[in-house]
Amino acid sequence: MAVLGITIALLVWVATLLVISIWKQIYNSWNLPPGPFPLPILGNIFQLDLKDIPKSFTKLAKRFGPVFTLHLGSRRIVVLHGYKAVKEVLLNHKNEFSGRGDIPVFQEYKNKGIIFNNGPTWKDVRRFSLSILRDWGMGKQGNEARIQREAQFLVEELKKTKGQPFDPTFLIGCAPCNVIADILFNKRFDYNDKKCLRLMSLFNENFYLLSTPWIQLYNNFADYLRYLPGSHRKIMKNVSEIKQYTLEKAKEHLQSLDINCARDVTDCLLIEMEKEKHSQEPMYTMENVSVTLADLFFAGTETTSTTLRYGLLILMKYPEIEEKLHEEIDRVIGPSRVPAVRDRLDMPYMDAVVHEIQRFINLVPSNLPHEATRDTVFQGYVIPKGTVVIPTLDSLLYDSHEFPDPEKFKPEHFLNENGKFKYSDYFKAFSAGKRVCVGEGLARMELFLLLSAILQHFNLKSLVDPKDIDLSPVTVGFGSIPPQFKLCVIPRS
């Protein structure tokens, strides 16, 4: 009888929880955008393909329209699909939706740094970081010289492969890693430096793990899954190791800091910290400095590295495009002069290819989640404060009206009828508004200069027939992860 009583009590308890959950879901749905009816606790998880959530969003948008609501666990999510909705949220309502949506795997850093910070320090830290990055040449001539210098190191390393097959992941990745390391720490690594290779391995592994089905599940049901084994623990461990490195670099800088003569971004942040050392609520603590540096280091290395690597794979599949690029490089730059930013005006095809690579690979398809900072009326719906908002970037990059045959790689998407470069307002690979990527100018410059330098000196050779190269990402979640591959680079005669 005792066992039966306990069983009945448990059933009543579970039933009560289910009823409360259903009631909450229905109650909280008033005035929200439409969407599929959520199951208790689980929400709409079965409406999503965890191996390709952006594709699921596209299917749901066809059914419910460009603005729709999902419930995942206790999270209420509004998804925006298409140019009009995404642009309106990111630009016309940029203050109302400037919060950072909760990402549980990075919960420890929710109120620190730039990328995942959703606390009171975010605006000031971001504003100051942008200011010092500009001072250190972000998107300006200072960075052009840095990238040109690193491009020559990269070319020399590629020559050492002597035409033999190699995995480009870390060799190519060293170039953007060194550019951002010079800006942040006044330091560059040798291409075989163990610490550099270790850091890039951590960046690469985290970018991959963030895109796996388990992490998509974890970020929506963290309350139930956080104590289980899984790759979320590996990500947290990797982030801790990266942050430990930036913390050590900050401490090293502090020992020789001259507040009147900053050597790099780290010094600039530490000088602000020194100014606040008597404040009761300092913004620039050593913890916040180290997380900010880790954010910039990861973002400045991995995204550009992955884009370049994916770009090389694409060019091997389409050798006729590579040939056109060689012709343009030979005509504008020649065989020996170092590529420069000014060349972009005379190289519309290279400019178009760089943009098309970014559009086609769709590196961060669903953007990082935003959050409503206040109750907001949007297109006739009420989006309550705290709602996670996802402006899907892939819905712009793969818009079939703006980019005919969006599933195909076509540099012509960014060329007019006269062969001149044609910019598209749908090109939002770096997002837009208050949360736009702080390194957009640097990344654009790196992609153009590094790819130009590689193709100036080398022909790309695939180990398989170009027709057999599969460009499909191995997984799509936080990012679109390219397949692993090897290639040969053959010096051009």
From Swiss-Prot:
Pfam families, alphabetized: p450
InterPro entries assigned to the protein according to its UniProt record, in alphabetical order: Cyt_P450, Cyt_P450_CS, Cyt_P450_E_grp-I, Cyt_P450_E_grp-I_CYP2E-like, Cyt_P450_sf, Cytochrome_P450_fam2
Entry annotated with the keyword Lipid metabolism: yes
SUPFAM superfamilies attached to this UniProt entry: Cytochrome P450
Family annotation (Gene3D superfamilies): Cytochrome P450 (1.10.630.10)
Pathway: Lipid metabolism; fatty acid metabolism
UniProt KW keywords: Endoplasmic reticulum, Fatty acid metabolism, Heme, Iron, Lipid metabolism, Membrane, Metal-binding, Microsome, Mitochondrion, Mitochondrion inner membrane, Monooxygenase, NADP, Oxidoreductase
A biological process term (GO) from this entry: response to 3-methylcholanthrene
Binding-site residues, substrate: F298, A299, G300, T301, E302, T303
Transmembrane segment boundaries: none
EC number, as in UniProt: 1.14.14.1, 1.14.13.n7
CDD domains given in the database record: CYP2C-like (cd20665)
Catalytic activity: an organic molecule + reduced [NADPH--hemoprotein reductase] + O2 = an alcohol + oxidized [NADPH--hemoprotein reductase] + H2O + H(+); (5Z,8Z,11Z)-eicosatrienoate + reduced [NADPH--hemoprotein reductase] + O2 = 19-hydroxy-(5Z,8Z,11Z)-eicosatrienoate + oxidized [NADPH--hemoprotein reductase] + H2O + H(+); (5Z,8Z,11Z,14Z,17Z)-eicosapentaenoate + reduced [NADPH--hemoprotein reductase] + O2 = 19-hydroxy-(5Z,8Z,11Z,14Z,17Z)-eicosapentaenoate + oxidized [NADPH--hemoprotein reductase] + H2O + H(+); (4Z,7Z,10Z,13Z,16Z,19Z)-docosahexaenoate + reduced [NADPH--hemoprotein reductase] + O2 = 21-hydroxy-(4Z,7Z,10Z,13Z,16Z,19Z)-docosahexaenoate + oxidized [NADPH--hemoprotein reductase] + H2O + H(+)
One example GO MF annotation: enzyme binding
Cofactor entry: heme
Record text on activity regulation: The omega-1 hydroxylase activity is stimulated by cytochrome b5.
Binding residue positions for heme: C437
Similarity comment: Belongs to the cytochrome P450 family.
Function of the protein: A cytochrome P450 monooxygenase involved in the metabolism of fatty acids. Mechanistically, uses molecular oxygen inserting one oxygen atom into a substrate, and reducing the second into a water molecule, with two electrons provided by NADPH via cytochrome P450 reductase (NADPH--hemoprotein reductase). Catalyzes the hydroxylation of carbon-hydrogen bonds. Hydroxylates fatty acids specifically at the omega-1 position displaying the highest catalytic activity for saturated fatty acids. May be involved in the oxidative metabolism of xenobiotics.
Subunit structure: Interacts with chaperones HSP70 and HSP90; this interaction is required for initial targeting to mitochondria.
Name assigned to this protein: Cytochrome P450 2E1
Gene behind this protein: Cyp2e1
